[in-house]
């Protein structure tokens, strides 16, 4: 399915709610159970983090989740195995968020073969510069797996246009300068930045980093095609406050009808 399964999540003006879960935080059975829950709750796409010892783009909540996963002995192979098993039960698109090092350490061809086997539809590599994406981009294209770009508020628009011109799936627009994590509010220039990004691509644009309240979700999906919520989802899953995740999903869907 790959790129097509991601496209379907945005069809007919649908707004996408994309929760992030750390692969192996709490164990692999927990990972499968959380994916099943998020699918049943109506999430559009699930983003699955591959834990890494030097996660430069992650805020403290995601770093802690990654450390818990690594400390428990979870492996990349184990995460793929869990995804292969849960893919038989769910149709929700899977997008992996991984640093480049785990891909290269695993072997990039082998990593992408495992992605295909596990029904992974897209991959985000936050520390892979646009200039070096040929390290994995041709292999991903061949496998029909979207390499999803990150664009940032500090990037010049010409660079953003170049990055987006060769992208697939959706564009991940980073809404803060810095790492992931919970924020109180967003500055006005974020709105004009998101509108600018949207005006230069035919792909859906999804806002992420720092989105932690229903108000943030409502604000962002008014401008964008969806949101990624990471740190807050990890926090809510950890504290068994799943009904609040359902409220986030509801807030996203309501904007489709607005």
UniProtKB/Swiss-Prot annotation:
Family: Belongs to the TrpA family.
GO CC field: cytosol
Assembly mode: Tetramer of two alpha and two beta chains.
Encoding gene per record: trpA
Family annotation (NCBIfam families): trpA
Annotated catalytic residues: 47, 58
Listed PROSITE patterns: TRP_SYNTHASE_ALPHA
Protein name: Tryptophan synthase alpha chain
Keyword Lyase carried by entry: yes
Pathway assignment: Amino-acid biosynthesis; L-tryptophan biosynthesis; L-tryptophan from chorismate: step 5/5
EC number per UniProt: 4.2.1.20
Catalytic activity: (1S,2R)-1-C-(indol-3-yl)glycerol 3-phosphate + L-serine = D-glyceraldehyde 3-phosphate + L-tryptophan + H2O
């Amino acid at each position: 399915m790959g790129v097509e399964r991601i496209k379907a999540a945005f069809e007919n003006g649908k707004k996408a709610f994309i929760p992030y879960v750390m692969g192996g935080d709490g164990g692999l059975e927990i990972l499968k159970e959380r994916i099943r829950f998020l699918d049943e709750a109506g999430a559009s796409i699930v983003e699955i983090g591959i834990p890494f010892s030097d996660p430069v783009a992650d805020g403290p909540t995601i770093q802690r989740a990654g450390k818990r996963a690594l400390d428990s002995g979870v492996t990349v192979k184990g995460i793929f195995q869990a995804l292969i098993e849960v893919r038989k039960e769910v149709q929700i698109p899977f997008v992996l968020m991984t640093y480049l090092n785990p891909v290269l350490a695993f072997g990039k061809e082998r990593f992408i073969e495992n992605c295909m086997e596990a029904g992974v539809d897209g991959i985000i590599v936050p520390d892979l510069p646009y200039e070096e994406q040929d390290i994995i981009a041709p292999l991903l294209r061949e496998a029909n797996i979207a390499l999803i770009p990150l664009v940032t508020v500090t990037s010049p628009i010409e660079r953003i246009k170049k990055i987006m011109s060769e992208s697939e799936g959706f564009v991940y627009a980073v809404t803060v300068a810095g790492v992931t994590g919970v924020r109180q509010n967003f500055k006005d220039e974020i709105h004009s930045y998101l509108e600018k990004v949207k005006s230069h691509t035919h792909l859906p644009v999804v806002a992420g980093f720092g989105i932690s309240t229903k108000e943030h979700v409502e604000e962002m999906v008014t401008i964008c095609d969806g949101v990624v919520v990471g740190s807050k989802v990890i926090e809510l899953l950890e504290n068994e406050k799943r009904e609040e995740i359902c409220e986030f999903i509801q807030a996203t869907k309501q904007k489709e009808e607005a």
